[in-house]
Amino acid sequence: MGNVFFLLLFSLTHFPLAQQSRCTLTIGISSYHSSPCSPTQPVCTWNLDLNSLTTDQRLHPPCPNLITYSGFHKTYSLYLFPHWIKKPNRQGLGYYSPSYNDPCSLQCPYLGCQAWTSAYTGPVSSPSWKFHSDVNFTQEVSQVSLRLHFSKCGSSMTLLVDAPGYDPLWFITSEPTQPPPTSPPLVHDSDLEHVLTPSTSWTTKILKFIQLTLQSTNYSCMVCVDRSSLSSWHVLYTPNISIPQQTSSRTILFPSLALPAPPSQPFPWTHCYQPRLQAITTDNCNNSIILPPFSLAPVPPPATRRRRAVPIAVWLVSALAAGTGIAGGVTGSLSLASSKSLLLEVDKDISHLTQAIVKNHQNILRVAQYAAQNRRGLDLLFWEQGGLCKAIQEQCCFLNISNTHVSVLQERPPLEKRVITGWGLNWDLGLSQWAREALQTGITILALLLLVILFGPCILRQIQALPQRLQNRHNQYSLINPETML
């Protein structure tokens, strides 16, 4: 068994398992592993496909009541942010200040609202990220190459797609999560002629679409409208929403989600409908699309094994075993000595008690002798009446004092020879006292030696790896771009 153990120890020390650390990106139940990265090689890279991410999001949505989005006719440029952020510069060169919120609290289809300043994504103070040093990416149609600093692994991110004129590609259903309140009357076109021009038909469609959007989201969303692009929009997707026929409203087609006709560029919205104010204001709004949130988790690298000299380990384990055995033997001997002294003291107490009982027995015998003498004297006095018992008409009593129990107690062997010492087992085996003690000590040393052989190498490895762990804990992550000082 010892040869098998040392052969296993030799194979583990000379053939360590090498595995590099990675960062895992999780969407639904799908996992995407990055390229090998670590504090010394801090760039984690993924090659992602937007269509696959969309499928993962649709099959396994991260939130139970999240409104899903539809497909769109072309892939737009991406903006990559930490989970819910403010972006002061749209050229991708400024700081990205994360403001973390729960993505499952989304309630709006979020038409025309600015993603990073919308009402339900209020900012929360948190550390800043820089685009080129902490996170960056490149895109070719639907393929995205994502690069993340290893120190940011473990955070959450969201991909935002900049879709010109169209916020976002949510699919609006006709069954809201809770019954909406009574809708206010639809705004008349005549009240908006100074804002919405030049097409009355498109104006009516947009207003009706805003109204249906507000109803489906329980009037908790902001809807934005751009005046300059109303005449150039075209129908992209028609959701299956039933429209109740009202005599006061015009007959229109199904409301449509729209995009500006190519080659329009991203533009700021100029007018926004505020549900709380129930009016269209001239706030500046931007547009974006929210793709599924990402959950990042670092994969800890396995502990590296160093090559060690087997003879040193053998001698060290043997020395530990011998030392432990000697310590166990000394401890066992001291324990046996203390047990013997305790038995001797108990034996002395028993002998004293026996002597006291014997003395009391002797005193009782003397008293019995005196009583017998008095009995004989009384019998002589009542001899003419037939004796004492017949004279007092009582049953005669005779005293029989026995010394058997005391003699049995005195004849028993000493307590040390009758009590089993050690582990509570019957170690008699017909051996002498010193032979039994030697047998117990030998078995104790053998058991301790086996324990040291089994657990000694593991303890040694942990002790040798402790300085390296402490050193790695105090190392700071290096940055992709040292000039950013992040």
Curated annotation (Swiss-Prot):
Topological domains, Cytoplasmic: 460-486
Region (Fusion peptide): 309-329
Pfam families found in the cross-reference section: TLV_coat
Highest taxon of the lineage: Viruses
Assigned GO CC terms: host cell plasma membrane; membrane; viral envelope; virion membrane
Disulphide bridges, residue numbers: C221-C224, C221-C397, C389-C396
Leader sequence residues: 1-18
Glycan-linked positions: N136, N218, N240, N286, N400
Gene3D superfamilies associated with the record: 1.10.287.210
Placement of sequence motif CX6CC: 389-397
Position of sequence motif CXXC: 221-224
Post-translational modification: Specific enzymatic cleavages in vivo yield mature proteins. Envelope glycoproteins are synthesized as an inactive precursor that is N-glycosylated and processed likely by host cell furin or by a furin-like protease in the Golgi to yield the mature SU and TM proteins. The cleavage site between SU and TM requires the minimal sequence [KR]-X-[KR]-R.
Lipid-attached positions, S-palmitoyl cysteine: C458
Region (Immunosuppression) residue spans: 372-388
A Gene Ontology BP annotation from the UniProt entry: fusion of virus membrane with host plasma membrane
Extracellular side: 19-438
Keyword entries, A-Z: Cleavage on pair of basic residues, Coiled coil, Disulfide bond, Fusion of virus membrane with host cell membrane, Fusion of virus membrane with host membrane, Glycoprotein, Host cell membrane, Host membrane, Host-virus interaction, Lipoprotein, Membrane, Palmitate, Signal, Transmembrane, Transmembrane helix, Viral attachment to host cell, Viral envelope protein, Viral penetration into host cytoplasm, Virion, Virus entry into host cell
Record text on subunit structure and interactions: The mature envelope protein (Env) consists of a trimer of SU-TM heterodimers attached by a labile interchain disulfide bond.
Function field: The surface protein (SU) attaches the virus to the host cell by binding to its receptor. This interaction triggers the refolding of the transmembrane protein (TM) and is thought to activate its fusogenic potential by unmasking its fusion peptide. Fusion occurs at the host cell plasma membrane.
Protein name listed in UniProt: Envelope glycoprotein gp63
Species this chain originates from: Human T-cell leukemia virus 2 (HTLV-2)
Protein encoded by which gene: env
